[in-house]
């Protein structure tokens, strides 16, 4: 069975806009997805990138135009300037890592619900209640938000190192 390494950030609007197309592609080709959330804010300086807030105003403006265009094309609701962005991506990423390790639910649905919470629902994905709600909606035990924090932190850090080694420079990256 083929495996797809999916590097992403729960803060990334482009990961949100990718929707569930990866999961559809994997299902159509009998491939397995390894979800690898990483710290995109730490990735940018290590790979020659610039965080959105530090980009030239013309680039910032065009980014919003392109995000709106893509959201319309994909028929996805989007708030171009979410109230809780950027926020701490670590808690939601740790929950995804814990859910992947635990199994039993729908990981793609979990990832999409966290991204949707940030980019369409004005929720703070660093908040425990939001993470628990997303876990439950995807068929996972909400207590995963609390368990595996140490393992989640270790894996989250390793995912960043793996991303740099693999030539990842943004999110999503496959």
Language model: regions and residue ranges:
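C-terminal cap of thioredoxin/glutaredoxin-like
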Residues: 4, 10-31, 101-104, 109, ...
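Structural alpha/beta surface segment adjacent to cysteine/selenocysteine redox centers
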Residues: 10, 17-118
């Amino acid at each position: 069975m083929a495996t797809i390494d999916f590097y992403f950030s729960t803060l990334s609007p482009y990961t949100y806009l990718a929707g569930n197309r990866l999961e559809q592609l994997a299902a159509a080709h009998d491939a397995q997805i390894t979800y690898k959330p990483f710290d995109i804010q730490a990735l940018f300086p290590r790979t020659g990138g610039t965080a959105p807030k530090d980009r030239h105003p013309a680039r910032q403006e065009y980014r919003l135009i392109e995000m709106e265009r893509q959201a319309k094309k994909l028929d996805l609701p989007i708030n171009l300037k979410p109230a809780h962005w950027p926020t701490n991506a670590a808690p939601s990423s740790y929950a995804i890592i814990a859910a992947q390790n635990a199994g039993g639910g729908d990981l793609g649905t979990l990832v999409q619900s966290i991204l949707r919470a940030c980019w369409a629902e004005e929720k703070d994905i660093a908040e425990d209640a939001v993470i628990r709600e997303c876990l439950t909606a995807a068929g996972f035990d909400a207590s995963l938000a609390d368990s595996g924090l140490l393992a989640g932190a270790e894996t989250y850090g390793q995912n960043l190192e793996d991303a740099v080694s693999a030539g990842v420079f943004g999110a999503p990256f496959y």
